[in-house]
Curated annotation (Swiss-Prot):
Gene3D superfamilies: glutathione-dependent formaldehyde- activating enzyme (gfa). It comes from the Bacteria. Residues 24-171 form the CENP-V/GFA domain. NCBIfam families: formald_GSH (TIGR02820), PRK05417.1 (NF003829). Transmembrane segments: none annotated. It catalyses: S-(hydroxymethyl)glutathione = glutathione + formaldehyde. This is Glutathione-dependent formaldehyde-activating enzyme. Its EC number is 4.4.1.22. Pathway: One-carbon metabolism; formaldehyde degradation; formate from formaldehyde (glutathione route): step 1/3. SUPFAM superfamilies: Mss4-like. It comes from Paracoccus denitrificans. It is an enzyme of class 4 (lyase). Catalyzes the condensation of formaldehyde and glutathione to S-hydroxymethylglutathione. GO terms for molecular function: S-(hydroxymethyl)glutathione synthase activity; zinc ion binding.
Length: 194
C-alpha cells in the first residue's frame, strides 16, 4: 500500500470534499487584492468541477492542482474591477482573465464558436465565500504536474491520494467530457448526424 500521508493536492480538497447544496444558485468570486478586488457574479450552480494538473490553470500558493468548474457564460458577470482584468494568453483556446494586480484567474472564456465547450466559462469556486458549489468529481491532466516541477517519483502517492479523495485521476479530461468532445468533432466532420 502506498503511503499518502502528507500528500497535498489543493486546499479545497485536502481535508475532504464538501458536498454541493441542493438548490444552490451561485455566488460571488473575488480576487486576492485586499483593496478594490475584482468581483465576479456566478448566477448558477457549476458543473464538471475537478482538480486540474495542467500548467495553464491558476493554482493557489503551494497547491499542485487547481480546482476548476464550468458554468454557462450567460450566468457570469463582472461586477467590479473589470479594468483590472487582462487575458493571460489571447491565443489559447481558453482565454483566462486574471487580475493584473494579484494574478488570480477570475474566469476563463472560450470565444471560438466551433470549440466543443463554447458557451461555458471556467471558474475557480474557491474564490467565493459561499458554500454549496458543485463538488469536485475527478482529477484531470494529472501527469502535467510533472511539467510544473513535481518530482515524478511522487506520482504513485499523488494518484493514490486522489483516489482516496474520490477523485479518479485521468491524464486528459473525464470519459464523459472526452466523449462530448469526440461527439462534437464527429458531428462537425459528418461522421455522426448533427
Amino acid at each position: 500500500m502506498v503511503d499518502t500521508s502528507g500528500v497535498k493536492i489543493h486546499p479545497a480538497v485536502d481535508n475532504g470534499i464538501k458536498p454541493a447544496q441542493p438548490g444552490f444558485a451561485g455566488g460571488t468570486l473575488h480576487c486576492k487584492c485586499s483593496t478594490n478586488p475584482v468581483r465576479v457574479a456566478v448566477r448558477a450552480q457549476t458543473a464538471h468541477n475537478h482538480v486540474c494538473g495542467c500548467t495553464k490553470c491558476w493554482k493557489p500558493e503551494g497547491a499542485i492542482f487547481s480546482q476548476v468548474a464550468v458554468v454557462g457564460r450567460d450566468a457570469l458577470e463582472v461586477l467590479e474591477g473589470a479594468e483590472k482584468l487582462e487575458i493571460v494568453n489571447a491565443e489559447a483556446p481558453i482565454q483566462r482573465h486574471r487580475c493584473r494586480d494579484c494574478g488570480v484567474h477570475m474566469y476563463g472564456r472560450i470565444e471560438n464558436r466551433d470549440h466543443p465547450f463554447y458557451g461555458l466559462d471556467f471558474v475557480h469556486t474557491e474564490l467565493s465565500d459561499e458554500d454549496g458549489w458543485s463538488a469536485p468529481e475527478f482529477a484531470a491532466f494529472v501527469s502535467s504536474i510533472i511539467e510544473s516541477g513535481v518530482d515524478p517519483s511522487r506520482m504513485e502517492a499523488i494518484r493514490a491520494r486522489l483516489r482516496e479523495l474520490g477523485l479518479e485521476p485521468y491524464d486528459a479530461l473525464s470519459p464523459p467530457l472526452m466523449d462530448a468532445i469526440a461527439t462534437h468533432i464527429a458531428k462537425r466532420s459528418g461522421a455522426l448526424a448533427a
